[in-house]
Curated annotation (Swiss-Prot):
Catalyzes the transfer of a methyl group from 5-methyltetrahydrofolate to homocysteine resulting in methionine formation. One of its GO terms (biological process) is methionine biosynthetic process. Pfam families: Meth_synt_1, Meth_synt_2. Keywords: Amino-acid biosynthesis, Metal-binding, Methionine biosynthesis, Methyltransferase, Repeat, Transferase, Zinc. It catalyses: 5-methyltetrahydropteroyltri-L-glutamate + L-homocysteine = tetrahydropteroyltri-L-glutamate + L-methionine. Pathway: Amino-acid biosynthesis; L-methionine biosynthesis via de novo pathway; L-methionine from L-homocysteine (MetE route): step 1/1. The lineage of its organism: Bacteria, Pseudomonadati, Pseudomonadota, Gammaproteobacteria, Enterobacterales. CDD domains: CIMS_C_terminal_like, CIMS_N_terminal_like. It comes from Escherichia coli (strain SMS-3-5 / SECEC). This is 5-methyltetrahydropteroyltriglutamate--homocysteine methyltransferase. 5-methyltetrahydropteroyltri-L-glutamate binds at R17, E18, L19, K20, K117, R515, C516, W561, E605. Zn(2+) binds at H641, C643, E665, C726. Binds 1 zinc ion per subunit. L-methionine binds at I431, G432, S433, E484, D599. It comes from the Bacteria. The gene is metE.
Amino acid sequence: MTILNHTLGFPRVGLRRELKKAQESYWAGNSTREELLAVGRELRARHWEQQKQAGIDLLPVGDFAWYDHVLTTSLLLGNVPARHQNNDGSVDIDTLFRIGRGRAPTGEPAAAAEMTKWFNTNYHYMVPEFVKGQQFKLTWTQLLEEVDEALALGHKVKPVLLGPVTYLWLGKVKGEQFDRLSLLNDILPVYQQVLAELAKRGIEWVQIDEPALVLELPQAWLDAYKPAYDALQGQVKLLLTTYFEGVTPNLDTITALPVQGLHVDLVHGKDDVAELHKRLPSDWLLSAGLINGRNVWRADLTEKYAQIKDIVGKRDLWVASSCSLLHSPIDLSVETRLDAEVKSWFAFALQKCHELALLRDALNSGDTAALAAWSAPIQARRHSTRVHNPAVEKRLAAITAQDSQRANVYEVRAEAQRARFKLPAWPTTTIGSFPQTTEIRTLRLDFKKGNLDANNYRTGIAEHIKQAIVEQERLGLDVLVHGEAERNDMVEYFGEHLDGFVFTQNGWVQSYGSRCVKPPIVIGDVSRPAPITVEWAKYAQSLTDKPVKGMLTGPVTILCWSFPREDVSRETIAKQIALALRDEVADLEAAGIGIIQIDEPALREGLPLRRSDWDAYLQWGVEAFRINAAVAKDDTQIHTHMCYCEFNDIMDSIAALDADVITIETSRSDMELLESFEEFDYPNEIGPGVYDIHSPNVPSVEWIEALLKKAAKRIPAERLWVNPDCGLKTRGWPETRAALANMVQAAQNLRRG
């Protein structure tokens, strides 16, 4: 029983983000479709060869996507919304881009599909749309073409296909409502056809991804798996693939399926290997997801070996990444600025392939010397002073319940704040950022590259802040912001100023489409060596008599949008960040800043996949926010901003944050989101976003007034604020001025009654 290794997928974008550049060039009309397709072919060939050279036995094919793999599956099945269809019924790459972006070099523009998070990762997928009576047919043969490509290059391949039940689970019904699960029998013939085509090509194994099997699914969805896989059996061997959680709760459903193997995530799941071995059919292959596909840490391979060695020789076994390596940067070797000690702790996608080769060889031979050598740096890390800060650990251990409580309840604080700020009814503000112009980005880049000295950089930033204050005063806004000209990214900026974080040069991961992010890495205990935002907030406040908000990114969001440590809990990291930012709140307050906003857009995103695990997460997530904010005096007003499409199921936790003001994204839902706050009888102040900043369209005064009147039917007017949905970083100044002028006018009209 020779053990093989494989990956579940590989990053698509290219080491230098070649795919992003090719996509954006094509969209802008600066290159041809053939030039774009050529970049895709080149990247796929390179990535297969790199994995092979790193020691991978079975190469994934079908993991490449021009925008998103769920969208690729939609096209494969012929699921193209009517508004995006070509007149002749054909499907091409521009069809795909129109669904993803709303427009493409050919075809008519139309509303893009909805985009949402891929399970609990920071990757996004395009939500499939289903209509009653929908027809499906094999339409987009990208998978088959890529299999042919890989076979022609002489590779041993394992095609990757998103499974039918998960695909339906991820979608939404449009128009007349019906049960989307009823479409299962309509899509299965397409899957059968694809598997038959793969069998014709001599394919032995197909990785069929069903990550929905780690969720707490309704019984009807669990029951759908058996008939679905009965229909798919017999043409090739199927590796039923799950990830992001364990499968034990749904193992009875899984073991009844006519598949030949199961992949489990042994990093994020709590499945016991011995128990899995006992319960799986003896002729099934077990693919053990031992190497973390969604973090950047070098694995302790001696631990991984011990985790799996007892079943070696007892069943067919593969070793694999826990999930697709899509969520990891590509290659650590090109990082030239990382400290040597810190660099020795990391493994990016190619290094993870090497780990799988080492693990496979040791399991086949019984010789673990290479595993011990590889694991030495990560074992040494446990005692590094770069990791452990006794002062932080002592402070964290000393936290009491009092540290997460404001001195008085909201009603008392609100009186003190009204007396201090004397704001009018319907107070107007913005969410924080103003347009990041070419001048601002060039200024920051020149400073970063060393082409600009610190004095000239600070003079430039000060000028942009001054301009933002002047603009806001001219517009008549009531509570101002400094505009965040000095900030590149709301998480990266804070990470750069906190001890315990490091940054990469090329650690890009795909977020969606052509958007890539370079998350900070938490390597050790987090602390704040010096004030971060105080200087610029104080400067902005000196330019005006109106209150200027201090702007912080909250602890849970910084955690969720970074690569976290693996040696301590997420709760520990969040609370360390909260303590560091608590000191920032105190310093802002001491500098005369009376309104402080702590953004937590990721609080809901961080929810565990299983609802039964939500309470524990929300408890420490809320506590981290409160630790951050509770140092504020009664007359300091704490704001928070959140952009979710669903609040109902976490309203208790939103209220428990005890922010004085919460601003939320509501314009696209026509204020429907406020229902949650009305039904809950939310006690504090709310700023429902009155226009969508993601669109360049300028809302009319009448439209904003109508939205605010609608809001006032749900929330008492004396507790309502007036603000856009989100920060204005991505907008231009002309539409920003026009939209804010109309927003201020609408508020003034309502004050006059």
